[in-house]
């Protein structure tokens, strides 16, 4: 699945949205470290990245050629500022119609429409891949993201009051959402 588009962010900057490929491994690793270190809304901590560069590059190459999965990047000039992607929930027939969506945007770029553009691109890619349902989990306190998801047609279908546990011992409620495509 291929994607390549330029958008204008709310700050007037041109942002290039494109597929990740095997050569983006280092930049994606750096983005992971930054985004996962500056907010508690994401699934993991910076030190929990489980892929080395070789493994990450292999996975990115596979995703770049996949007909039903995609990893998209947002670049401000040559600076990687966000990533988003979809992948199937599973390979069994009974769940083959469902995909999961994930996204991370550098905090300095929140509120500029970049997350929305990546999400809309992923929704279109999910439709093109033949999925009929797109799913995500979001921390309940992340009201900006939840509002964006609602506007895109996602609906809440469940809550887990102890969905995430932080290293401080506190819990975060996680909202499960889905959109019919």
Question: Predicted regions: what is each one?
Answer:
Residues 1-11:
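Short acidic N-proximal helix/loop "leader" segments that mark the beginning
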Residues 11, 30-47:
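Helix-loop element at the rim of GNAT/NAT acetyltransferase active sites that forms part
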Residues 15-27:
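A short beta-loop-alpha structural element at the N-terminal edge
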Residues 20, 105, 138:
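Hydrophobic adenine-recognition pocket in adenosine-nucleotide-binding enzymes
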Residues 48-108, 180:
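Acetyl-CoA-dependent GNAT
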Residues 109, 113-121:
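Conserved acetyl-CoA pyrophosphate-binding loop and the N-cap/start of the following alpha-helix
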Residues 119, 126-137:
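Conserved GNAT acetyl-CoA-binding A-motif
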Residues 135-138, 150, 155-172:
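Conserved catalytic-core motifs of GNAT/GCN5-like acyltransferases
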């Amino acid at each position: 699945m291929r994607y390549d588009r330029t958008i204008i962010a709310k700050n007037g900057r041109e942002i290039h949205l494109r597929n990740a490929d095997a050569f983006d491994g280092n930049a994606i690793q750096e983005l992971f470290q930054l985004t996962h270190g500056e907010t508690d809304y994401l699934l993991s901590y910076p030190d929990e990245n489980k892929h080395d560069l070789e493994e990450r590059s292999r996975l990115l190459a596979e995703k770049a050629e996949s007909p039903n999965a995609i990893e998209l990047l947002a670049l401000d000039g040559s600076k990687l500022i966000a990533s988003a992607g979809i992948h199937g929930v599973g390979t069994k027939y009974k769940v083959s119609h469902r995909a999961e969506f994930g996204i991370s945007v550098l905090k300095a770029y929140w509120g500029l429409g970049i997350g929305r553009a990546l999400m809309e691109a992923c929704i279109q890619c999910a439709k093109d891949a033949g999925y009929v349902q797109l799913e995500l989990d979001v921390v309940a306190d992340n009201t900006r993201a939840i509002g964006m998801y609602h506007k895109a047609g996602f609906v809440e279908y469940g809550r887990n009051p102890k969905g995430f546990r932080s290293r401080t011992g506190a819990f975060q409620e996680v909202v499960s959402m889905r959109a019919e495509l």
